[in-house]
């Protein structure tokens, strides 16, 4: 893959992946940030995936186009986002490793990647350094998906998932608190507390779930 910055505040990226005898995936992405006066900015993040079966097609016939767009407005410590995501195809948008996709509506408990699914998201993030302590931030996101049609899954996905319903819909709400250590031996250690709630109807196929997750990340410089 490759990325480029052809003009100020615009980043373009393109990648290609192959899962041998299953599918090929091409990715295009763009991010643009438009500065405004007074610590304000408007940004646009677009992601597009195109997946088709390849070789022995062990995952069956695959022909999906999936894209997402997030429009964000930042004002000082506050950031508001409105996102939309769409899957075009009879099968879910699939990938190899969880957490390895750049789609705006990929949440903590669901990726909102069902066949023919359309989803939208509202989110809010705040940097609490000015009113609490440096390194502390929080966020909340709500995503709702609908129009999921599992009635045209290929035989491989139908057997594996066991889904067959139409008019599937679901929603998820995620809360996040993050703290990044500012000084000392543990400097840059990131601690995240995440709480996700997912609710769905029977046709969507996934489970109703509440999940509390504590995550710690410490970057290490090798070179």
Each language-model region and where it sits:
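Transmembrane beta-strand segments that form the barrel wall of outer-membrane beta-barrel proteins
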Residues: 9-20, 31, 42-52, 138-142, ...
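Residues that define the transmembrane beta-barrel architecture of outer-membrane proteins
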Residues: 22-26, 63-67, 116-120, 169-173, ...
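Residue-level signature of outer-membrane beta-barrel architecture
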Residues: 3-6, 32-34, 72-75, 84-86, ...
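Repeated loop/turn-to-beta-strand initiation elements of outer-membrane beta-barrel proteins
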Residues: 8-13, 37-44, 77-82, 89-91, ...
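Outer-membrane beta-barrel "beta-signal"
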Residues: 122, 175, 179, 208-223
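Outer-membrane beta-barrel translocator/channel fold
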Residues: 39-115, 119, 202-207
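Structural signature of outer-membrane beta-barrel domains
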Residues: 19-21, 49-53, 85-91, 129, ...
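C-terminal structural cap/anchor segments
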Residues: 77-178
